Design a protein with these regions (language model features):
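Active-site rim helix/loop that mediates acceptor-substrate recognition in acyltransferases
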Residues: 28-53, 69-70
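Conserved beta-strand in the GNAT
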Residues: 51, 57-68, 80, 85
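Conserved acetyl-CoA-binding loop-helix of GNAT-fold acetyltransferases
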Residues: 86, 92-105
Length: 128
């Protein structure tokens, strides 16, 4: 696995066009409105969105829902890691691991347990 210097930080509005364009080029339906909604949820402290950049280029992201959508997690106040993506050209570089490490460290400040949702149908794409 090749490793690289990755900058991981919270999503801001300036990131949205580049993120939406990156997924549009892959043919994935992840419009700018999705990230604008995430930004609103982030401002309301419902979700944190961590974005990864390699040499200034968007490489991937992961979100933490502080009040899980999955009822068994929500009932026990377990934060949920959802919508975790690394662009294909940046896979096998440790970016996903670094995003997950960041999520785990943030969650550890409020919970000993983290939940994660996984898509298991072909339209979700490759697990990373």
């Amino acid at each position: 696995m090749k490793t690289c210097n990755v900058d991981i930080r919270l999503l801001d509005s300036n990131d949205i066009p580049e993120i939406a364009q990156a997924f549009r080029e892959l043919g994935w339906n992840k419009p700018a409105s999705q990230y604008a909604h995430y930004l609103v949820e982030q401002a309301l402290e419902l979700r944190d969105v961590y974005v990864a950049f390699v040499e200034g280029t968007f490489a991937g992201y992961l979100t933490i829902c502080w009040k899980a959508g999955y009822e068994p997690f929500r009932e026990k106040n377990i934060p949920e890691i959802v919508d975790f993506n690394v662009l294909p050209q940046f896979r096998r570089m440790g970016i996903g691991s670094q995003l997950m490490d960041k999520a785990e460290s943030e969650i550890a400040m409020v919970s000993r347990i983290a939940g994660i949702g996984m898509g298991v149908t072909a339209d979700y794409g490759a697990a990373q």
